[in-house]
C-alpha cells in the first residue's frame, strides 16, 4: 500500500508475525505473557494490535474518521486493523480501500512505536503521522506524473 520502504517493512513484519508478542516471548523464555497496557493474559498479536481494551478508543477514532470522511460506515474489524484488508461484504471503491489500507498501516506503525508503553497511542499521533506520510505519497504520485489520482483518493 506504500512505496515507503519502512512502511513496507512494517507490513512484512506484521504479516509474518516477526514482532514478538508477550505470548510468543512466554513460549521462548520464562517471562510473563501479560499485556503491558492492560495486564490481560495472553497478549497475542491480535490482542496487541486490536483487541486490547486500552486500544479501543484509538481504533474507534480511526474507524469514525473514515466513516465521516467516506460518508459510509467502516466497520471495526481485526482483519482491517491488523492487515489493512476490508471484509468482502463491504462496498468500497479501490481508491477507498487503498486509503483505508494505507491509514491502517500508519496506525499499526504508531502502535509498534509504542509497543511496550503502558499508554496506548493517541488518535492525534496517528493523524499527525498520516499527514506527514501523505506528503511522501503525494511526492510519489507527482514523480509518476499522476497527481490527479492522489487527489481523487
Question: Model regions: which residues?
Answer:
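Family-specific functional microsites
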Residues: 1-153
Amino acid at each position: 500500500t506504500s512505496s515507503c520502504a519502512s512502511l513496507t517493512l512494517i507490513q512484512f513484519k506484521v504479516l509474518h508475525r516477526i514482532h514478538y508478542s508477550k505470548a510468543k516471548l512466554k513460549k521462548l523464555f520464562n517471562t510473563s505473557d501479560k499485556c503491558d497496557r492492560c495486564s490481560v493474559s495472553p497478549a497475542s498479536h491480535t490482542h496487541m494490535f486490536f483487541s486490547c481494551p486500552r486500544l479501543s478508543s484509538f481504533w474507534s477514532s480511526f474507524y469514525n474518521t473514515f466513516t465521516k470522511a467516506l460518508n459510509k460506515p467502516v466497520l471495526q474489524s481485526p482483519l482491517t486493523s491488523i492487515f489493512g484488508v476490508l471484509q468482502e461484504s463491504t462496498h468500497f471503491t479501490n481508491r477507498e480501500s487503498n486509503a483505508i489500507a494505507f491509514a491502517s498501516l500508519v496506525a499499526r506503525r504508531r502502535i509498534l512505536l509504542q509497543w511496550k508503553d503502558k499508554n496506548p497511542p493517541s488518535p492525534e499521533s496517528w493523524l499527525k503521522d498520516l499527514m506527514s506520510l501523505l506528503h511522501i505519497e503525494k511526492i510519489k504520485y507527482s514523480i509518476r506524473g499522476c497527481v490527479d489520482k492522489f487527489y481523487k483518493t
